[in-house]
Amino acid sequence: MNKHIFALFRGAVLLLGFALLTGCAQAPAEVSSVSGQPSALLTNESAIVYNVTPEYVFTYAENQTEDYPTTQGAYRFAQLVNKRTQGRIQIRVYANAQLGDETSTLEQLRFGGLDFARCSLSTMTAYSEMSNALMLPYLYRDADHMWAVLEGEIGRKISDSFIETGLVPLSWYDAGVRNFYFTKPVSTLDEMQGLVIRVQPVEMMEDMIRLLGASALPVSYENVYSAIQRGEADGAENNWSSYDAMHHNEVAPYYLLDEHMRVPESQIISAVTWDLLSVEDRQIIKECSALSADYERMLWSAREDEARARVMESGCTEITLSEDEKKKFRDAMEPLYKKYCGDYMDLVDQIRQTGAPDPQ
């Protein structure tokens, strides 16, 4: 079967199947609303309509809501590709986990059941042990450090490590920085001892909490508020947007800026789909993906700024971790680094040194 006809046939089948399955969609992950968006949200219908028969109709899986920055980034990507190809390549975005959660969409990508998806690095690490190095706690000095790593040689090397598994990362999306928040002021490692802190059910995060001297309590996202309110947890950790969206500031009003984890997200194309494309079309896809990442990061920054302003106005107390204390937190992570990246400590050192100021 001609590869163009195959892509169109598969696209038509998927469009019909997903329309029927929409009512069975899984709930979106963590944050459910967005601020700082343009007045008109992008949708599949926002794209210019060209009077042509498309060569390709591709599917794009997104587990967040329509107004979430990563979803809007996906729509922007689809628009850009549509415009660059004059309607020859069309991409349909399915938000709200219509096509499954991140774990299942990655599997579908690997075998060509889906064409594109946006997934968190924390989910992707199952397919590249090396990629654990990008999400180690207290690894990055700041956001600029992380972007320098992701968009440089290290980021390209780690992206390439996924290709043999059937995944081709295209660009990196922002997901903010995670901080702790508590029912009482906490500003030192000593004050962390014995606390119970809610974390996602991710082994690395549970290990991080234990190494800081606290107890990890894996609780579903929607139950964090009640767990803190009932005294089952002394606090939790997340970014400003999640903290605001779920009103956790009402029960844990002390927000500690420790910046323990930055976990980027990636826009991915299936290797099966990638192999269908010409060299010229691959270049268009890469360029449009990079532009959509810039757009998503702009939306994310606006969202976080507004979330922070809102919770501060409500009476939240922001606590800054001193450099001496942050070093203590960072030093406590050495066993975790060796556990998850023992074979890649040279890479970890390269990440640490990226963009580092020259010693005086």
Residue ranges and their predicted role:
Residues 1, 157-162:
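Short, solvent-exposed secondary-structure boundary motifs
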Residues 2-13:
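Bacterial N-terminal signal peptides that target proteins for export
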Residues 19-23:
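C-terminal motif of bacterial Sec signal peptides marking the signal peptidase cleavage site
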Residues 25-144, 163-360:
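N-terminal secretory/targeting leader peptides
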Residues 144-159:
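A gly/proline- and charged-residue-enriched helix-loop-helix capping module
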